[in-house]
């Protein structure tokens, strides 16, 4: 218990908790429509884009967020346009962008000396990466995502399940898809430095899948995913501090355990 109390005396831990909880909440709320629209791997693609952008920023000595945010937002919008206006499917478009951006990041880091530690934290995350700017941005991002759900819940529901019907009823499908893409891009950028490029997409996918295993209504899945994501992050970050393991990997394993537990519960429920 004393070790747990000691954990909260460190400012960087407190910042990591605040940013992580808000990013986990945003990722889960955005993840539900993305998973249902079969666009869930956008998180993986955008994290690789962010890795490439951050690698260039570090190599040039620039501030990371001002470089990575516009690049990842543009990549998200580009992916959206590629899937809407070309014959390329969403999975193929994400694969092309993801592989290209990852290749850029790897080449840049290989040509730059003294970046081994920075690359390690980019790939697998670090709680030391959070600063006050991350806290402020995560608060603003969370507010934007909550406003989207509170004010435009029914429109979001419509574009998630039937874009043609939503378009026929006057919903601006393109606008809401763009908003989803931009918010997802911001979530990935903010969460990647703590979770790592290889693992940040799990915050988008796991809570939504776990909630969909347990519940059937859209509203129930959204609320359950949000709660699960926050709880799993808190357990993962605490476990990471106690056991000295990487934050991103620990949070993913906690999410995996929750997913497997939900599957087991549902199988027992069907068998009884």
Model-predicted segments: where are they?
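C-terminal binding/interaction regions
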Residues: 3-9, 123-127, 228-265
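Short loop segments and helix-boundary regions at transmembrane helix junctions
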Residues: 32-115, 211-223, 240-243, 266-268
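Membrane-interface capping segments at transmembrane-helix boundaries
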Residues: 154-155, 264-272
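Transmembrane alpha-helical segments in multi-pass inner-membrane proteins
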Residues: 198-249
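Transmembrane helix-bundle core of multi-pass membrane transporters
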Residues: 3-15, 86, 94-154, 182
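Loop-to-transmembrane alpha-helix initiation sites
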Residues: 16-19, 64-72, 91-95, 139, ...
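Helix-loop-helix "hairpin" substructures at the membrane interface of multi-pass membrane proteins
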Residues: 134-207
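Generic alpha-helical transmembrane segments of integral inner-membrane proteins
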Residues: 21, 25-29, 70-78, 104, ...
